[in-house]
Amino acid sequence: MKYKLFIFLLGCSPFLLGRIQDWLMMNLLGVPLLFLSVLMLLFWGYLSHLSLNLTNSDWKALILLNTPATIDLLLVLIQELGFGAYWMNRIGTYSQLFYLPLLPLGFRLTPWAHTVSPAYIAAFLCMIACSLFVYKKNG
């Protein structure tokens, strides 16, 4: 039971990483955003490997680790597509910060998009693909 909560909390780490990247972008010029996206995927791969070692089940690890990403994706899509604006509170702010490290990659994968939603979805799919790659490689 404890490992389930631990893996779920590991899945929440992009909130902190997004906040750190937000601070870097506000205080430093020339932050290499695409490089940070690649680092985030490498970190997510490490978390995927760690979660697999704790559960010994690909699907259980995938679900536990990516549940926060799924919930956050739903939150940002509801805000953008449903309400047409992001909430002006901590939930609205932190739901955007979760995917901030991967948004540069998401935008590169969706150059045709005129809204942020496809970039969020692409970022989410990159996280899932990264986890699946690690599970197949180690499984």
Language model: regions and residue ranges:
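Short hydrophobic, aromatic-rich alpha-helical segments embedded in or entering the lipid bilayer
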Residues: 89-107
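Hydrophobic cores of alpha-helical transmembrane segments in multi-pass inner/ER membrane proteins
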Residues: 38-47, 119-132
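Membrane-helix interface and helix-disruption motif detector
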Residues: 22-33, 56-57, 83-89, 111-116
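Transmembrane alpha-helical insertion/packing segments
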Residues: 1-44
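Canonical alpha-helical transmembrane segments
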Residues: 36-64
